[in-house]
Amino acid sequence: MVFTKKLCYTDSKGTFEPINKEDIPMQLTVRQPSASEDAKHYTTERLRGEYLIETVFAPDDAILTYSHFDRIIAGGVMPVSKSVELVGCTELASDTFLQRREMGVINIGGKGKISVDGVEYDLKQYDGLYVGMGAKTLSFTSDDPADPAKFYINTCPAHKTYPTVKIDIDKANKRPLGSVETCNKRVINQYIHPAVMQSCQLCMGMTQLAPGSNWNSMPCHTHERRMEVYFYFDLKDNNVVFHMMGEPTETRHLLMHNEQAVISPSWSIHTGVGTSNYTFIWGMCGENQEFDDMDNIDPIDLR
C-alpha cells in the first residue's frame, strides 16, 4: 500500500508544527515493503504503484520517497527561483533531516550549490557529494534559474559520522564493462564506495551507457543483503526503458520514462533495456558494501 504524506518542519525550538500546504518545503511518499510471493500476482497498475517513482523533480521543491526496504529515501531537489531546504520531519521523528542518516547527492542538471552547516559546495553536472550523519542544515540553490541544478538524492540510516566529501566525476572509481557486441558497453562510476571514500552503509554511483548500447546489468543478478534504487535519465525524447524486476523465475517489467526511479527489493533482479542509450544512478544500502556480493543469473535461466 502507498501512503502520501506532507512533511512538517521544526520551529526554532525543535517543536514539530503543521504548516499550510503552500508553505510545505518538501513532500514525502511512504512505501511499505512487499513480499516476492505477493508481487508475482500484481497487476501492472499495482506494480507501478509499489515500485515506480514517477515524479522525482519539481521546480522549487523536494520530492522524496521513503521506502521501508532498508529505509532508504530517494528523490530530487530542484531549486529554481529560490533555495530549497531539507529539514526534520515527523516521519523521521528527527529535529534535522540527517540527525540519524547519511546522504549522497549527484547533480544531473546545471551548476548549483549545496550548503551543509554553512559550508558551500559547488556542483556542476555529474558531480557528487556525500554528507555524513549529524549535519544540521542542508540548503540547495541553482546558479542559473534558466538552467537549474537537479540534485538526485539517496539517504539511509547511519550509525557513525563520516566527513562530508565532494566527489567530482573525475574522482569516481571507474569500471568499464560490457561490449558493443552484447549491446551493453558501459562505464560504472562509483562515487560513494569503499574504493573512493568511507560511509556507513550507503553506496551510490552512476552508470553511463555508450551510444549503440541499451542493456544495463545484463547478465543480471540479485543481492539478498542489499536493496537498490535505480534512477534513469539522459533518455532521449520519445524513448523508454523496459526495466526488468521480480524473482529470476517470475520476471515482470515496468516501462520507465526519462527522470524516473524504481525501487528494487533485495529479492528482485534489476536490469533494463532501452530504445536508446541512457544513464542511470544506482544507490544501495543494507548488510554490506561489497559491490561484487551478488548472485549472478544466466540469461537462459530467466523466466
PLM features: what roles do these ranges have?
Residues 5-25:
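Short, Lys/Arg-enriched N-terminal segments with co-localized hydrophobic residues
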Residues 26-89, 93-94, 102-103, 302:
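Hydrophobic, proline/glycine-rich low-complexity stretches
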Residues 60-92, 185-228:
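A short glycine-rich, His/Asp/Glu-containing loop-to-beta-strand
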Residues 66, 198-269, 274-277:
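Acidic/His-leaning functional-site neighborhoods
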Residues 97-125, 232-258:
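A short beta-strand-loop-beta hairpin characteristic of the jelly-roll/cupin
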Residues 109-148, 152-157:
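Acidic, low-complexity central loop/insert segments
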Residues 123-142, 255-276, 285:
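Conserved metal-binding segment of the jelly-roll/cupin
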Residues 145-186, 281-303:
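Double-stranded beta-helix
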